[in-house]
From Swiss-Prot:
Domain of life: Eukaryota
Pfam families the record matches: UTP15_C, WD40
WD repeat residue intervals: 36-75, 78-117, 120-159, 162-202, 204-242, 246-285, 287-326
Organism: Mus musculus (Mouse)
Location within or outside the cell: Nucleus, Nucleolus
Composition bias, Basic and acidic residues: 497-516
Lineage: Eukaryota, Metazoa, Chordata, Craniata, Vertebrata
Name by which UniProt lists this protein: U3 small nucleolar RNA-associated protein 15 homolog
Length: 528
Protein backbone atom coordinates (compact mmCIF):
# COMPACT_ATOMS: atom_id res chain seq x y z
CA UNK A 1 0.00 0.00 0.00
CA UNK A 2 1.44 3.35 -1.03
CA UNK A 3 1.98 5.91 1.71
CA UNK A 4 0.22 9.25 1.94
CA UNK A 5 1.82 12.00 -0.10
CA UNK A 6 1.72 15.41 1.65
CA UNK A 7 0.17 18.37 -0.11
CA UNK A 8 2.76 20.32 -2.07
CA UNK A 9 2.60 23.95 -1.00
CA UNK A 10 3.28 26.19 -3.96
CA UNK A 11 5.81 28.89 -3.19
CA UNK A 12 5.80 32.36 -4.70
CA UNK A 13 8.65 34.85 -4.97
CA UNK A 14 8.50 37.53 -2.30
CA UNK A 15 9.50 41.04 -3.28
CA UNK A 16 11.32 42.42 -0.27
CA UNK A 17 11.97 46.06 0.48
CA UNK A 18 15.19 47.55 -0.73
CA UNK A 19 17.72 47.53 2.07
CA UNK A 20 19.35 50.95 2.37
CA UNK A 21 21.70 52.52 4.88
CA UNK A 22 18.75 54.36 6.43
CA UNK A 23 16.87 51.09 6.85
CA UNK A 24 19.82 49.54 8.66
CA UNK A 25 20.37 52.67 10.76
CA UNK A 26 16.78 53.23 11.92
CA UNK A 27 16.04 49.53 12.42
CA UNK A 28 18.99 49.23 14.79
CA UNK A 29 16.88 49.84 17.90
CA UNK A 30 15.93 47.41 20.64
CA UNK A 31 12.38 46.38 21.45
CA UNK A 32 10.59 49.50 22.75
CA UNK A 33 10.04 50.02 26.45
CA UNK A 34 6.53 51.27 27.20
CA UNK A 35 5.79 53.52 30.18
CA UNK A 36 2.26 54.42 31.23
CA UNK A 37 1.67 58.09 32.05
CA UNK A 38 -1.30 59.77 33.75
CA UNK A 39 -2.62 61.34 30.55
CA UNK A 40 -1.84 62.12 26.94
CA UNK A 41 1.87 62.86 26.47
CA UNK A 42 1.88 66.35 24.94
CA UNK A 43 5.64 67.02 24.92
CA UNK A 44 8.96 65.18 25.21
CA UNK A 45 12.24 67.11 25.41
CA UNK A 46 15.81 65.86 25.91
CA UNK A 47 18.39 67.72 27.93
CA UNK A 48 21.24 68.94 25.67
CA UNK A 49 23.81 68.08 28.35
CA UNK A 50 24.90 64.89 30.06
CA UNK A 51 23.38 62.60 31.28
CA UNK A 52 20.78 63.43 28.59
CA UNK A 53 17.69 63.05 30.76
CA UNK A 54 14.35 63.83 29.16
CA UNK A 55 11.27 65.67 30.39
CA UNK A 56 7.80 64.23 29.75
CA UNK A 57 4.76 66.50 30.00
CA UNK A 58 1.54 64.61 30.69
CA UNK A 59 -1.61 65.73 32.49
CA UNK A 60 -0.70 68.05 35.40
CA UNK A 61 2.80 66.67 35.94
CA UNK A 62 6.27 66.83 34.44
CA UNK A 63 8.39 63.72 34.88
CA UNK A 64 12.16 63.70 34.42
CA UNK A 65 13.40 60.30 33.29
CA UNK A 66 16.94 59.03 33.17
CA UNK A 67 18.17 57.86 29.83
CA UNK A 68 17.80 54.17 30.69
CA UNK A 69 15.41 54.35 33.63
CA UNK A 70 11.77 53.33 33.55
CA UNK A 71 10.88 55.29 36.67
CA UNK A 72 11.01 59.09 36.92
CA UNK A 73 14.02 60.46 38.77
CA UNK A 74 12.17 63.72 39.51
CA UNK A 75 8.60 64.98 39.30
CA UNK A 76 7.25 68.54 39.12
CA UNK A 77 3.60 68.66 40.12
CA UNK A 78 3.10 72.31 41.17
CA UNK A 79 0.40 72.86 38.57
CA UNK A 80 -3.24 73.69 39.26
CA UNK A 81 -4.31 72.30 35.90
CA UNK A 82 -2.80 70.67 32.81
CA UNK A 83 0.89 71.36 32.15
CA UNK A 84 2.24 72.00 28.65
CA UNK A 85 5.51 72.05 26.76
CA UNK A 86 8.25 71.46 29.34
CA UNK A 87 11.53 72.54 27.68
CA UNK A 88 15.16 72.39 28.85
CA UNK A 89 17.60 75.29 28.65
CA UNK A 90 20.82 74.78 26.67
CA UNK A 91 22.85 74.19 29.84
CA UNK A 92 20.32 71.60 31.07
CA UNK A 93 19.96 73.30 34.48
CA UNK A 94 16.60 75.03 34.06
CA UNK A 95 13.22 73.88 32.81
CA UNK A 96 10.33 76.08 31.68
CA UNK A 97 6.70 74.99 31.20
CA UNK A 98 3.30 76.48 30.41
CA UNK A 99 -0.03 75.57 31.95
CA UNK A 100 -3.77 75.67 31.40
CA UNK A 101 -4.22 78.59 33.82
CA UNK A 102 -1.92 80.86 31.75
CA UNK A 103 1.06 80.87 34.14
CA UNK A 104 4.59 80.18 32.86
CA UNK A 105 6.75 78.48 35.48
CA UNK A 106 10.54 78.15 35.63
CA UNK A 107 12.09 75.24 37.53
CA UNK A 108 15.55 74.30 38.71
CA UNK A 109 16.34 70.70 37.81
CA UNK A 110 17.73 70.08 41.29
CA UNK A 111 14.79 71.66 43.11
CA UNK A 112 11.04 71.19 43.35
CA UNK A 113 9.41 74.59 43.79
CA UNK A 114 9.34 76.94 40.78
CA UNK A 115 12.07 79.60 40.68
CA UNK A 116 9.97 82.05 38.67
CA UNK A 117 6.32 82.44 37.75
CA UNK A 118 5.44 84.66 34.81
CA UNK A 119 1.83 85.82 34.93
CA UNK A 120 0.37 87.78 32.04
CA UNK A 121 -1.46 85.40 29.74
CA UNK A 122 -5.21 85.11 30.20
CA UNK A 123 -5.56 81.66 28.65
CA UNK A 124 -3.65 78.39 28.35
CA UNK A 125 0.04 78.62 27.41
CA UNK A 126 0.89 75.83 24.94
CA UNK A 127 4.40 76.80 23.84
CA UNK A 128 7.47 78.08 25.72
CA UNK A 129 11.17 78.19 24.87
CA UNK A 130 14.44 79.78 25.95
CA UNK A 131 16.16 82.31 23.71
CA UNK A 132 19.75 81.84 22.56
CA UNK A 133 21.20 84.02 25.35
CA UNK A 134 19.50 81.81 28.03
CA UNK A 135 18.19 84.92 29.87
CA UNK A 136 14.78 85.25 28.25
CA UNK A 137 11.72 83.06 27.73
CA UNK A 138 9.24 83.19 24.85
CA UNK A 139 5.66 82.01 25.37
CA UNK A 140 2.58 81.69 23.17
CA UNK A 141 -0.97 81.22 24.42
CA UNK A 142 -4.61 80.76 23.46
CA UNK A 143 -5.21 84.48 24.06
CA UNK A 144 -3.61 85.05 20.60
CA UNK A 145 -0.53 86.74 22.14
CA UNK A 146 3.20 86.03 22.17
CA UNK A 147 5.20 87.34 25.13
CA UNK A 148 8.90 87.78 25.86
CA UNK A 149 9.93 87.46 29.52
CA UNK A 150 13.11 88.46 31.36
CA UNK A 151 14.29 85.71 33.71
CA UNK A 152 16.45 87.73 36.18
CA UNK A 153 13.77 90.41 36.75
CA UNK A 154 10.71 88.13 36.35
CA UNK A 155 9.11 90.78 34.15
CA UNK A 156 7.36 90.92 30.83
CA UNK A 157 9.42 92.71 28.18
CA UNK A 158 7.32 92.59 25.02
CA UNK A 159 3.88 91.47 23.89
CA UNK A 160 3.07 90.66 20.27
CA UNK A 161 -0.56 90.62 19.14
CA UNK A 162 -0.01 89.59 15.54
CA UNK A 163 -1.98 86.32 15.51
CA UNK A 164 -5.75 86.05 15.17
CA UNK A 165 -6.18 82.57 16.67
CA UNK A 166 -4.63 80.20 19.20
CA UNK A 167 -0.81 80.13 19.30
CA UNK A 168 -0.02 76.44 19.72
CA UNK A 169 3.65 76.03 18.79
CA UNK A 170 6.90 77.95 18.63
CA UNK A 171 10.67 77.83 18.90
CA UNK A 172 13.55 80.24 19.38
CA UNK A 173 16.62 80.64 17.19
CA UNK A 174 19.75 78.96 18.55
CA UNK A 175 21.99 81.62 16.98
CA UNK A 176 20.18 84.95 17.33
CA UNK A 177 18.73 85.78 20.79
CA UNK A 178 16.26 88.25 19.25
CA UNK A 179 14.56 85.91 16.75
CA UNK A 180 11.82 83.39 17.50
CA UNK A 181 9.08 81.66 15.51
CA UNK A 182 5.45 80.94 16.37
CA UNK A 183 2.73 78.93 14.66
CA UNK A 184 -0.98 79.53 15.10
CA UNK A 185 -4.38 78.10 14.26
CA UNK A 186 -4.87 81.13 11.99
CA UNK A 187 -2.83 79.11 9.42
CA UNK A 188 0.21 81.39 9.65
CA UNK A 189 3.79 81.05 10.85
CA UNK A 190 5.34 84.32 12.00
CA UNK A 191 8.96 85.23 12.75
CA UNK A 192 9.42 87.93 15.37
CA UNK A 193 12.39 90.17 16.09
CA UNK A 194 12.56 91.57 19.61
CA UNK A 195 14.34 94.66 18.28
CA UNK A 196 11.46 95.71 15.99
CA UNK A 197 8.46 94.92 18.22
CA UNK A 198 6.67 93.23 15.31
CA UNK A 199 6.91 90.21 13.04
CA UNK A 200 9.51 90.45 10.31
CA UNK A 201 8.23 87.55 8.19
CA UNK A 202 4.93 85.74 7.79
CA UNK A 203 4.25 82.59 5.75
CA UNK A 204 0.87 81.00 5.03
CA UNK A 205 0.79 77.31 5.85
CA UNK A 206 -2.79 76.77 4.74
CA UNK A 207 -3.80 74.62 7.73
CA UNK A 208 -3.85 75.10 11.52
CA UNK A 209 -0.18 74.92 12.49
CA UNK A 210 0.61 72.23 15.07
CA UNK A 211 4.42 72.34 15.14
CA UNK A 212 7.31 74.46 13.86
CA UNK A 213 11.01 73.71 13.66
CA UNK A 214 13.96 75.97 12.88
CA UNK A 215 17.12 74.40 11.47
CA UNK A 216 20.27 75.01 13.57
CA UNK A 217 21.72 77.20 10.81
CA UNK A 218 18.60 79.38 10.84
CA UNK A 219 18.23 79.21 7.07
CA UNK A 220 15.32 76.77 6.85
CA UNK A 221 12.00 76.68 8.65
CA UNK A 222 9.68 73.66 8.84
CA UNK A 223 5.97 73.91 9.65
CA UNK A 224 3.48 71.10 10.22
CA UNK A 225 -0.29 71.32 10.13
CA UNK A 226 -3.06 69.23 8.68
CA UNK A 227 -1.54 66.48 6.56
CA UNK A 228 1.24 68.74 5.29
CA UNK A 229 4.85 69.32 6.28
CA UNK A 230 6.25 72.40 4.54
CA UNK A 231 9.83 73.63 4.31
CA UNK A 232 10.49 77.38 3.88
CA UNK A 233 13.67 79.17 2.86
CA UNK A 234 14.26 82.00 5.32
CA UNK A 235 17.08 83.53 3.28
CA UNK A 236 14.75 84.00 0.29
CA UNK A 237 12.03 85.81 2.18
CA UNK A 238 10.05 82.75 3.21
CA UNK A 239 9.94 81.02 -0.17
CA UNK A 240 8.29 77.59 -0.10
CA UNK A 241 10.86 74.92 -0.95
CA UNK A 242 8.78 71.76 -0.71
CA UNK A 243 5.39 70.60 0.56
CA UNK A 244 5.30 67.04 1.88
CA UNK A 245 2.07 65.06 2.11
CA UNK A 246 3.05 61.61 3.34
CA UNK A 247 0.71 61.29 6.33
CA UNK A 248 -2.96 60.36 6.29
CA UNK A 249 -3.93 62.42 9.33
CA UNK A 250 -2.82 65.59 11.10
CA UNK A 251 0.93 65.97 11.69
CA UNK A 252 1.46 66.89 15.34
CA UNK A 253 5.22 67.01 15.97
CA UNK A 254 8.58 67.53 14.27
CA UNK A 255 12.13 66.60 15.19
CA UNK A 256 15.63 66.73 13.68
CA UNK A 257 18.26 64.03 13.95
CA UNK A 258 21.53 64.86 15.68
CA UNK A 259 23.36 65.30 12.38
CA UNK A 260 20.61 67.47 10.91
CA UNK A 261 20.48 65.20 7.84
CA UNK A 262 17.12 63.63 8.71
CA UNK A 263 13.77 65.20 9.56
CA UNK A 264 11.21 63.22 11.59
CA UNK A 265 7.46 63.88 11.75
CA UNK A 266 4.82 62.25 13.95
CA UNK A 267 1.12 62.13 13.16
CA UNK A 268 -2.28 61.03 14.38
CA UNK A 269 -2.10 58.21 11.81
CA UNK A 270 0.24 56.43 14.29
CA UNK A 271 3.31 56.73 12.07
CA UNK A 272 6.67 58.48 12.34
CA UNK A 273 8.16 59.37 8.95
CA UNK A 274 11.89 59.95 8.43
CA UNK A 275 12.78 62.34 5.58
CA UNK A 276 16.08 63.13 3.95
CA UNK A 277 16.83 66.85 4.25
CA UNK A 278 18.45 66.87 0.81
CA UNK A 279 15.85 65.09 -1.33
CA UNK A 280 12.91 65.38 1.12
CA UNK A 281 11.86 61.81 0.37
CA UNK A 282 10.72 59.31 2.99
CA UNK A 283 13.65 57.03 3.79
CA UNK A 284 12.09 55.14 6.72
CA UNK A 285 8.88 54.82 8.71
CA UNK A 286 7.96 53.68 12.25
CA UNK A 287 4.56 52.29 13.27
CA UNK A 288 3.04 52.77 16.72
CA UNK A 289 -0.03 51.54 18.55
CA UNK A 290 -1.79 54.88 19.03
CA UNK A 291 -1.92 58.42 17.66
CA UNK A 292 1.32 60.33 18.20
CA UNK A 293 1.46 63.71 19.95
CA UNK A 294 5.16 64.21 20.72
CA UNK A 295 8.54 63.01 19.52
CA UNK A 296 12.16 63.52 20.59
CA UNK A 297 15.64 62.17 19.79
CA UNK A 298 18.58 62.06 22.17
CA UNK A 299 22.21 62.91 21.51
CA UNK A 300 23.65 60.88 18.58
CA UNK A 301 20.16 59.41 18.01
CA UNK A 302 20.82 56.87 20.76
CA UNK A 303 17.24 57.00 22.05
CA UNK A 304 13.94 57.82 20.37
CA UNK A 305 10.98 58.66 22.60
CA UNK A 306 7.40 58.94 21.34
CA UNK A 307 4.40 60.13 23.36
CA UNK A 308 0.90 59.02 22.40
CA UNK A 309 -2.70 60.02 23.05
CA UNK A 310 -3.41 56.95 25.20
CA UNK A 311 -0.78 58.00 27.74
CA UNK A 312 1.83 55.47 26.59
CA UNK A 313 5.44 56.58 26.34
CA UNK A 314 7.43 54.44 23.90
CA UNK A 315 11.21 54.45 24.43
CA UNK A 316 13.60 52.80 21.99
CA UNK A 317 17.32 52.46 22.71
CA UNK A 318 19.92 51.82 20.06
CA UNK A 319 21.50 48.40 20.08
CA UNK A 320 25.04 48.33 21.41
CA UNK A 321 27.75 46.68 19.37
CA UNK A 322 28.29 43.16 20.63
CA UNK A 323 31.80 42.57 21.82
CA UNK A 324 33.52 39.53 20.40
CA UNK A 325 34.37 37.12 23.19
CA UNK A 326 36.89 34.36 22.65
CA UNK A 327 35.24 31.03 23.42
CA UNK A 328 37.33 28.11 24.67
CA UNK A 329 38.54 26.03 21.77
CA UNK A 330 36.82 22.69 21.45
CA UNK A 331 38.95 19.59 21.31
CA UNK A 332 38.99 18.12 17.83
CA UNK A 333 38.07 14.43 17.43
CA UNK A 334 40.87 11.95 16.98
CA UNK A 335 41.86 10.71 13.55
CA UNK A 336 40.50 7.23 14.20
CA UNK A 337 37.05 8.69 14.62
CA UNK A 338 36.96 9.75 10.97
CA UNK A 339 38.27 6.46 9.55
CA UNK A 340 36.13 4.23 11.73
CA UNK A 341 34.41 1.57 9.62
CA UNK A 342 36.03 2.55 6.34
CA UNK A 343 38.14 -0.59 6.20
CA UNK A 344 35.26 -2.96 6.91
CA UNK A 345 34.67 -5.53 4.18
CA UNK A 346 31.15 -6.71 3.48
CA UNK A 347 30.46 -10.39 4.10
CA UNK A 348 28.15 -12.56 2.06
CA UNK A 349 25.98 -13.37 5.07
CA UNK A 350 25.47 -9.73 6.12
CA UNK A 351 21.88 -8.53 6.31
CA UNK A 352 21.11 -4.88 5.53
CA UNK A 353 18.38 -3.42 7.73
CA UNK A 354 16.97 -0.05 6.68
CA UNK A 355 14.86 2.08 8.98
CA UNK A 356 12.04 3.90 7.17
CA UNK A 357 12.27 7.64 7.57
CA UNK A 358 9.39 8.99 9.59
CA UNK A 359 7.54 11.71 7.74
CA UNK A 360 6.24 14.67 9.68
CA UNK A 361 2.73 15.62 8.61
CA UNK A 362 1.09 18.97 9.19
CA UNK A 363 -2.34 19.12 10.77
CA UNK A 364 -4.13 19.65 7.48
CA UNK A 365 -2.25 16.69 5.96
CA UNK A 366 -3.43 14.46 8.80
CA UNK A 367 -7.01 15.59 8.21
CA UNK A 368 -6.76 14.97 4.47
CA UNK A 369 -5.18 11.57 5.11
CA UNK A 370 -8.23 10.67 7.19
CA UNK A 371 -10.61 12.26 4.62
CA UNK A 372 -11.71 14.97 7.07
CA UNK A 373 -11.96 17.62 4.38
CA UNK A 374 -14.03 20.14 6.36
CA UNK A 375 -11.60 20.03 9.28
CA UNK A 376 -8.66 20.47 6.91
CA UNK A 377 -10.26 23.57 5.40
CA UNK A 378 -11.09 24.95 8.85
CA UNK A 379 -7.48 24.48 9.94
CA UNK A 380 -6.07 26.57 7.08
CA UNK A 381 -8.73 29.28 7.54
CA UNK A 382 -7.41 30.18 10.99
CA UNK A 383 -6.39 33.88 11.22
CA UNK A 384 -2.73 33.03 11.80
CA UNK A 385 -2.55 30.94 8.61
CA UNK A 386 -4.67 33.32 6.54
CA UNK A 387 -2.55 36.37 7.36
CA UNK A 388 0.94 34.88 7.40
CA UNK A 389 0.75 32.04 4.86
CA UNK A 390 -2.22 32.48 2.52
CA UNK A 391 -0.48 30.26 -0.05
CA UNK A 392 -1.06 27.29 2.29
CA UNK A 393 -4.80 27.97 2.33
CA UNK A 394 -4.88 28.30 -1.45
CA UNK A 395 -2.91 25.06 -1.87
CA UNK A 396 -5.41 23.16 0.31
CA UNK A 397 -8.34 24.61 -1.66
CA UNK A 398 -6.58 23.54 -4.86
CA UNK A 399 -6.08 20.01 -3.48
CA UNK A 400 -9.74 19.77 -2.46
CA UNK A 401 -10.72 20.92 -5.96
CA UNK A 402 -8.49 18.24 -7.50
CA UNK A 403 -10.14 15.59 -5.34
CA UNK A 404 -13.59 16.92 -6.22
CA UNK A 405 -14.61 17.43 -2.57
CA UNK A 406 -14.41 21.23 -2.29
CA UNK A 407 -18.21 21.53 -2.36
CA UNK A 408 -18.46 19.00 0.49
CA UNK A 409 -15.90 20.96 2.52
CA UNK A 410 -17.74 24.26 2.01
CA UNK A 411 -21.26 22.94 2.63
CA UNK A 412 -23.02 22.80 5.98
CA UNK A 413 -21.33 25.81 7.59
CA UNK A 414 -22.81 28.29 10.01
CA UNK A 415 -22.75 32.09 9.76
CA UNK A 416 -19.34 32.50 11.41
CA UNK A 417 -17.64 29.88 9.24
CA UNK A 418 -19.15 31.20 6.00
CA UNK A 419 -18.04 34.71 6.95
CA UNK A 420 -14.49 33.45 7.49
CA UNK A 421 -14.41 31.87 4.01
CA UNK A 422 -15.84 35.01 2.39
CA UNK A 423 -13.31 37.21 4.19
CA UNK A 424 -10.48 35.12 2.77
CA UNK A 425 -11.94 35.36 -0.73
CA UNK A 426 -12.38 39.13 -0.44
CA UNK A 427 -8.83 39.52 0.82
CA UNK A 428 -7.08 37.44 -1.86
CA UNK A 429 -9.38 37.13 -4.89
CA UNK A 430 -7.81 40.08 -6.70
CA UNK A 431 -4.27 38.72 -6.39
CA UNK A 432 -3.14 37.26 -9.74
CA UNK A 433 -1.27 34.35 -8.14
CA UNK A 434 -4.39 33.14 -6.28
CA UNK A 435 -7.16 34.18 -8.68
CA UNK A 436 -7.47 30.95 -10.78
CA UNK A 437 -8.07 28.81 -7.68
CA UNK A 438 -10.21 31.25 -5.71
CA UNK A 439 -12.54 32.12 -8.60
CA UNK A 440 -13.62 28.48 -8.73
CA UNK A 441 -14.07 28.43 -4.95
CA UNK A 442 -16.16 31.62 -5.10
CA UNK A 443 -18.45 30.11 -7.74
CA UNK A 444 -18.98 26.99 -5.63
CA UNK A 445 -19.76 28.87 -2.42
CA UNK A 446 -22.22 31.13 -4.27
CA UNK A 447 -24.00 28.08 -5.71
CA UNK A 448 -24.22 26.44 -2.29
CA UNK A 449 -25.46 29.41 -0.24
CA UNK A 450 -27.52 31.23 -2.88
CA UNK A 451 -30.82 29.71 -1.62
CA UNK A 452 -30.24 31.02 1.94
CA UNK A 453 -29.23 34.58 1.05
CA UNK A 454 -31.31 37.02 3.08
CA UNK A 455 -31.34 35.01 6.29
CA UNK A 456 -28.16 36.56 7.74
CA UNK A 457 -27.32 40.26 7.44
CA UNK A 458 -23.62 39.58 8.13
CA UNK A 459 -23.30 37.04 5.31
CA UNK A 460 -25.34 39.26 2.98
CA UNK A 461 -22.96 42.18 3.53
CA UNK A 462 -19.98 39.95 2.74
CA UNK A 463 -21.60 38.77 -0.48
CA UNK A 464 -22.25 42.40 -1.46
CA UNK A 465 -18.59 43.27 -0.81
CA UNK A 466 -17.53 40.26 -2.89
CA UNK A 467 -19.83 41.38 -5.71
CA UNK A 468 -18.41 44.92 -5.64
CA UNK A 469 -14.87 43.49 -5.69
CA UNK A 470 -15.65 41.37 -8.75
CA UNK A 471 -17.28 44.31 -10.54
CA UNK A 472 -14.28 46.51 -9.79
CA UNK A 473 -11.91 43.82 -11.07
CA UNK A 474 -13.97 43.52 -14.26
CA UNK A 475 -13.70 47.28 -14.76
CA UNK A 476 -9.94 47.06 -14.30
CA UNK A 477 -9.70 44.28 -16.85
CA UNK A 478 -11.81 46.26 -19.34
CA UNK A 479 -9.60 49.33 -18.93
CA UNK A 480 -6.48 47.22 -19.35
CA UNK A 481 -7.84 45.67 -22.54
CA UNK A 482 -8.65 49.12 -23.89
CA UNK A 483 -5.13 50.26 -23.07
CA UNK A 484 -3.67 47.20 -24.79
CA UNK A 485 -5.78 47.93 -27.86
CA UNK A 486 -4.47 51.49 -28.00
CA UNK A 487 -0.89 50.28 -27.65
CA UNK A 488 -1.37 47.66 -30.39
CA UNK A 489 -2.72 50.33 -32.74
CA UNK A 490 0.26 52.61 -32.03
CA UNK A 491 2.75 49.79 -32.53
CA UNK A 492 1.05 48.73 -35.77
CA UNK A 493 1.21 52.30 -37.09
CA UNK A 494 4.88 52.60 -36.20
CA UNK A 495 5.69 49.23 -37.82
CA UNK A 496 3.89 50.15 -41.05
CA UNK A 497 5.72 53.48 -41.29
CA UNK A 498 9.07 51.83 -40.68
CA UNK A 499 8.53 49.05 -43.26
CA UNK A 500 7.64 51.37 -46.24
CA UNK A 501 10.41 53.99 -46.51
CA UNK A 502 10.47 56.35 -49.50
CA UNK A 503 13.69 55.86 -51.58
CA UNK A 504 15.77 58.99 -51.78
CA UNK A 505 16.93 58.45 -55.44
CA UNK A 506 13.38 58.34 -56.85
CA UNK A 507 12.35 61.80 -58.11
CA UNK A 508 9.18 63.32 -56.84
CA UNK A 509 7.60 63.51 -60.33
CA UNK A 510 8.50 61.53 -63.47
CA UNK A 511 8.54 63.38 -66.86
CA UNK A 512 5.62 62.49 -69.08
CA UNK A 513 6.50 60.54 -72.28
CA UNK A 514 5.06 61.89 -75.56
CA UNK A 515 3.26 59.12 -77.41
CA UNK A 516 1.35 59.45 -80.68
CA UNK A 517 -2.01 57.90 -81.06
CA UNK A 518 -2.09 55.31 -83.90
CA UNK A 519 -5.45 56.57 -85.10
CA UNK A 520 -4.30 60.16 -85.68
CA UNK A 521 -2.57 60.88 -89.01
CA UNK A 522 0.87 62.48 -89.00
CA UNK A 523 1.74 65.87 -90.56
CA UNK A 524 3.38 64.16 -93.57
CA UNK A 525 0.18 62.29 -94.38
CA UNK A 526 -1.78 65.53 -94.20
CA UNK A 527 0.53 67.29 -96.70
CA UNK A 528 0.36 64.39 -99.09
Amino acid sequence: MAGYKPVAIQTYPVLGEKITQDTLYWNNYKTPVQIKEFGAVSKVDFSPQLPYNYAVTASSRIHIYGRYSQEPVKTFSRFKDTAYCATFRQDGQLLVAGSEDGVVQLFDINGRAPLRQFEGHTKAVHTVDFTADNYHVVSGADDYTVKLWDIPNSKEILTFKEHSDYVRCGCASKLNPDLFVTGSYDHTVKIFDARTNKNVLCVEHGQPVESVLLFPSGGLLVSAGGRYVKVWDMLKGGQLLVSLKNHHKTVTCLCLSSSGQRLLSGSLDRKVKVYSTTSYKVVHSFDYAASILSLALSHQDETIVVGMTNGILSVKHRKSEAKKTSLPRRRRPAYRTFIKGKNYLKQRDDIMVSRPAKKHLEGYDKDLKSFRVSQALDRVLEPKCVIRTPEVTVSIIKELTRRGVLANALAGRDEKEVTRVLNFLIRNLSQPRFAPVLINAAEIIIDIYLPVIGQSSVVDKKFIVLQELVEKEIDYQRELLETLGMMDMLFATMTRNDSDPVPEHVPAELPEEKTESPTQPSDTDKNS
